[in-house]
Amino acid sequence: MCLRFFTWCLVCFMFVPALAWAQHPNNKAEQAIRNEIERQSRREAGQLKRAGWKVMPNKTSIEQQVRDVRFMEAATHAQSGERLYLISSSCASDSSYLMARRKADMSARDKMVQQVISLIYNSGAENARSNGELEQLPFIAENGTVTSAHLQYVVPVLECYRMDRDGCYEVLVTIRADYARTCQVINAVLYQK
């Protein structure tokens, strides 16, 4: 009994460190990626500040917003490796801050819709090519049937402004949406499922 327990403990003490050692290179690689994203986001935030961009009072700092956006761009699902978020940015000018913000937001949404349509179409074309059915690509409805209302879980993640020489507000907005759900909804609309 004692020998069995001793053998079990010996195996466990050898097996657990081996697992930890096997995961160690992954942690180093992840940390290197994390450090690179941090470095790039600090550089980009510095460029925005030097260009005169500011955030509204009571908003998160530019550094933190840029950092969050960069990590969202790199975020993937643990099992499938699929992206988690769609990211889109746009800039607009107006004499009113709210109108400039609204224009930039709508433009970013429209860009995101076109991005998703392109992703879905390219994926469908690639699947048809790999199956040897190039001339039998499925019919895709007119792009006008897909609107920004089909985007799922849209959230602004970066919002900053600057004043131009004419006294107009120039607003930069970056939004994110759920990748899988948005692609699923727009795919259903495009193929009219």
Residue ranges of each PLM-predicted region?
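Bacterial N-terminal signal peptides that target proteins for export
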Residues: 1-9
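Bacterial N-terminal signal peptides
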Residues: 8-17
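Domain-level marker for long, solvent-exposed, non-transmembrane regions
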Residues: 21-193
